[in-house]
Every structure is written in C-alpha cells, then in structure tokens.
A protein has these predicted regions:
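Residue-level signal for mature regions of secreted extracellular proteins and peptides
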Residues: 19, 23-26, 224, 275-278
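Radical SAM enzyme [4Fe-4S]-AdoMet core and its adjacent flexible, acidic
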Residues: 21, 42, 86-89, 111-117, ...
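Secreted/extracellular small peptides and ectodomain modules produced from precursors
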Residues: 24, 31, 64, 229, ...
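Short loop/turn motifs at secondary-structure junctions
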Residues: 29, 59, 108, 147-148, ...
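Residues that line or immediately flank small-molecule/substrate-binding pockets and catalytic motifs
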Residues: 37, 67, 116, 184, ...
Length: 299
C-alpha cells in the first residue's frame, strides 16, 4: 500500500519544514504546562550539523523552533541569523518575555508565534503576574521591527467563552488583526498516554474542554492540531531523538541516523494511518494510536 495522492502531496511538502526543540527548560512556571523540564540542551553546533545533513537530502524552506523557551539560549539570535542568511525562513514559538529582538539581522525572514492565553487577568493567572504586558509589548516591538507575528493560545473551559472578545481585544491593543491559533489544553487522553509530556498541572480554574466544546473549537476556529491533521514533520528533540511530529511519543530514530532513513520511517507511519483511516479529507497522522488525544473528536 502507498499513500493516497492527497497525503502524498502533503508529505512531500512537510519534508521542507523541519521542527527543532533545543531545550525543555523555560524561564516561566506556567500552571498548566505539561512538559517535564529535563536537562538535555542541543548545542548550536549540533543543530547546524543536523540542518546541514538534512539539506543534503531535501530542500529546506522553513525551520520552526520551540522549547522550553528558546530565547533563553545565548546562541539563539546568532543561530537564527545563520539560517536566514542561507535563505531559510524561521518560525519561533515563544512566550514573549525574553527580548533579544534587536540581535536578529533579518526580521522579515522570521515569524514569531507568541503565547497569549486570553485576556490579561486570565493569561497572568497561568503564566505569572505582569507577563501579558511583557508578551504584548514584545509583539508590538516585533511588529515595529518588521517581524512576522502570530498568537498561539491555549484554550480551557474558563477562556473558551471569551475567544471572540480576546480577538477583538488584541486587535485594539496591537492596532491590527493578528492571526490566532487555538490549542485546546492537552486532554486527559493525551496526558495518560504520553511517556514524557504528561504533567497534569493545575486544573482548578483551567478545566479541560468538554467533548462538545472540543468539537466546536475544532469546527469554528483555527486550531492546533488542525481538524484535518497533517501536522507531522521531522522533529528533532533536545535529547537527540527524532520524532514524526512535535508531540511524538515513539521516535523515528536519532539525530545521527541518515535523513533518508528518517523520511522512510515517517512514511511508514503515514501508510499505517491510511490503512485504518475513515476520516474524509484527512492529511494523516504520524502517531495513529495517539493523535494527540483528540481522535475521538474528529469526524
């Protein structure tokens, strides 16, 4: 069995987009964070070596960095500058509280995806007092310097009803309508089955969405994971393991493996998904037994 034409096209597209998680450590202590703050941190040299090897196997257009908090890495601005000088577009998922923006040489080649979890009081209840102000100021400065900007927002039962108000608030605050991607708080089905990222955190005041709310969110808003899935890619983790997506549970291999071998393992996962898939217009998933804990909500 091979991939359907729809998934085959998407698979070839995602190979041009690499995800790297250099560290799990962070400068904040968010109450609903689900990741363990483990010690391994990829060096700048390790990252560049992996990217160089990757480029020998596939034309690389985009690299996305996430943590932890990558802006705490002393080498991070230099690393991004090296990549943008090579013509690679860089995306950075950040909490927006560590400002080294002046050290980036080509803002137009960088997209900053800043975490804002709702209106100021709610955001600060999770991420710490004063952090909404810091992150929104970071966004304003980034926009003024010429960076591309987006917002990434975790959704719980408490802020679910305020999403439209939140978008209007941001538009008034920033002076433009910014793209917002909503990320439902990791459901119990995710936390129970993920071997590492499984911290429940505080539930009081940050309740998990109900099944109905989850389905409505997937239907009505831009979400991650998207309702059509397809969010797989080669994803290098801080411990040197390589996964088939940023939330992977079973590695495809390790960073010293040949890139072609990693591609082959990813494709095998997608073929396995397609062999049992009943969803229409679905772009596939590299974790067919996991699906980030949202499989029951997909139709």
């Amino acid at each position: 069995m091979d991939l359907s034409p729809l998934v085959q096209r998407h698979y070839h597209d995602v190979l041009k987009h690499l995800y790297i998680n250099p560290l799990e450590k962070c400068n904040l202590r968010c109450k609903i964070c689900y990741t363990r703050k483990t010690n391994p941190i990829l060096s700048e040299e390790e990252i560049l070596a992996f990217i160089s090897k990757y480029e020998h196997a596939e034309k690389l257009s985009i690299v996305t960095f996430c943590g932890g908090e990558v802006f705490t890495l002393p080498y991070f601005p230099r690393l991004v500058n090296t990549l943008t000088e090579k013509g690679i577009f860089v995306q950075v998922i950040t909490n927006g509280t560590v400002d080294t923006l002046d050290k980036f040489s080509d803002p137009n080649s960088v997209n900053l995806i800043v975490s804002l979890d709702g209106l100021p009081d709610y955001h600060d209840a999770n991420r710490g007092k004063g952090n909404f102000l810091k992150s929104s100021a970071f966004l304003k400065k980034a926009q003024s310097l010429g960076f591309h900007t987006e917002v990434f927002s975790i959704v719980t039962r408490q802020n679910y009803k305020d999403l439209d108000e939140f978008e209007r608030y941001l538009a008034n605050l920033l002076g433009y309508r910014i793209s917002v991607t909503y990320h439902p708080r990791k459901p119990p089905a995710y936390l129970v089955h993920h071997p590492i990222s499984n911290i429940v955190g505080q539930v009081d005041g940050f309740d998990f969405l109900t099944p109905q709310e989850m389905r409505e969110l997937l239907r009505n808003k831009k979400t991650f994971p998207p309702k059509e899935l397809g969010c797989y890619q080669i994803a290098l983790a801080s411990d040197g393991k390589v996964y088939g997506c940023c939330e992977g549970t079973v590695p495809l291999g390790v960073m010293t493996d040949e890139i072609g071998q990693l591609f082959s393992q990813l494709k095998k996962r997608l073929i396995l998904w397609e062999s049992a898939n009943t969803l229409r217009n679905c772009l596939g998933c590299s974790q067919p037994d996991f699906v980030c804990g949202i499989k029951q909500y997909l139709t």
